[in-house]
Structures are given as C-alpha cells and as structure tokens.
From Swiss-Prot:
Role according to the record: Involved in the biogenesis of TorA. Acts on TorA before the insertion of the molybdenum cofactor and, as a result, probably favors a conformation of the apoenzyme that is competent for acquiring the cofactor.
NCBIfam families xref list: PRK04976.1
Swiss-Prot/TrEMBL GO biological process terms: protein complex oligomerization; protein folding
Transmembrane annotation, as ranges: none
High-level lineage: Bacteria, Pseudomonadati, Pseudomonadota, Gammaproteobacteria, Enterobacterales
Biological source species: Escherichia coli (strain SMS-3-5 / SECEC)
Underlying gene: torD
SUPFAM superfamilies assigned: TorD-like
Name by which UniProt lists this protein: Chaperone protein TorD
Length: 199
C-alpha cells in the first residue's frame, strides 16, 4: 500500500476489530453512515486494491440506512454468522478452521500484549488478530521499537491470519444474505492481502 500511513492502516484494523467483536449499537450504526465515515471511505478508496471492497461496503451501509429495524436485524445477522454453530455460519476463530489456536497467544506474548478481561472470547478470535495488527502498525509509526522487529512480528501475524481468513470471508459471503458482514470481511481480506504483500 502506498498512500495510507501506518497509523491509518492501524485505525482501519482497530475499526474492523471493533465491528467483528460485538453487535453494533445505535451510536455505531449512526457513525458508519455519517459524513465523517464517508470521508474516511474516500481515503481508503484512494488505495486502488481497496476501492471495490469499500464501494460494496458503502452500498451495504446505504441499504442498512433504509432497512427496517436495522440495528435489530444487523444484530440477528451478527448472531447467526458469528455466534451459532458452524453449519451455516462464519465462526470468527482460528480454531474453527483447523488452525493452531495457540499461535495468536505466542504472537501476543512476543508483542508484549495480553487480552483484555473485558473481552469474553477465546484468544484466537478474529478481533484479537486485528487488534494486534493495529498495535503493530501504530508501533511502526512511533519508531520506539526497531522497525525490523515489528515488521517481522507483523508478517508472522499476517501469515497466521491468512491461513484461515479466506475461508472465513467466503463463509461470510455464503451465509450473510443481507451482505453487511460479507462486505466487511471482503474489505478485511483485501486489506490483509495488501498488507501481507507490502513487505
């Protein structure tokens, strides 16, 4: 990626972590349809690989603004996709895709991070990977830790995530009939792919 700064990428990862970690509340629902978010989406679209995914997400957000009982319906989508059995869902855990659930714990230790007691999910939840990537990108921008060390850890995290993210995103597309989380997962997939290629 060429036009986005490390801090901007960190913000995108943190935002996605938040959206994949819990159902949207009324305030978040208002925020994603705001003029401020439209500006943010314009910035993201300046990165050509992200353009189509951001356009699709904006289309889903526009549809959301006219959806009856939008918050409740989106909450039902969230529960159906991420909290039910894996038969017709896209569970947001590395272990659901036969990946080593201990890998993220090792990466967190290497980064000097621990999971928050406020987040009542296993450590291999997608949001934890995204928070770690956000932290690493912020650290790259600060310059307090050698960039080579941070970049090595970033690549390890991206590699571990990439082993199951494509299947997760495919399941989101398959089972999210409204398409908000499908669009969100597609944006994440493209972002991670670009980040991974940007060695």
């Amino acid at each position: 990626m060429t036009t986005l700064t490390a801090q901007q990428i960190a913000c995108v990862y943190a935002w996605l972590a938040q959206l994949f970690s819990r159902e949207l509340d009324d305030e978040q629902l208002t925020q994603i349809a705001s003029a401020q978010m439209a500006e943010w989406f314009s910035l993201l679209k300046s990165e050509p690989p992200l353009t189509a995914a951001v356009n699709e997400l904006e289309n889903r957000i526009a549809a959301l603004t006219v959806r009856d009982d939008a918050r409740l319906e989106l909450a039902a989508d969230f529960c159906g996709l991420f909290l039910m059995t894996d038969k017709q869902a896209a569970l947001p855990y590395a272990s659901a895709y036969k990946q080593d659930e201990q890998e993220i714990k090792r990466l967190l230790v290497e980064a000097g991070m621990v999971t928050s007691g406020n987040f009542n999910e296993p450590a291999d939840h997608l949001a934890i990977y995204l928070e770690l990537l956000s932290h690493l990108h912020f650290s790259l921008g600060e310059g307090s830790v050698p960039a080579r060390r941070i970049d090595s850890l970033r690549q390890k995290t991206l590699t571990a995530l990439w082993e199951w993210l494509p299947e997760f995103a495919a399941r989101c597309r398959q089972y999210d009939s409204f398409g908000f989380y499908a669009a969100l997962s597609q944006l994440l997939l493209v972002l991670v792919e670009c980040d991974h290629q940007n060695r």
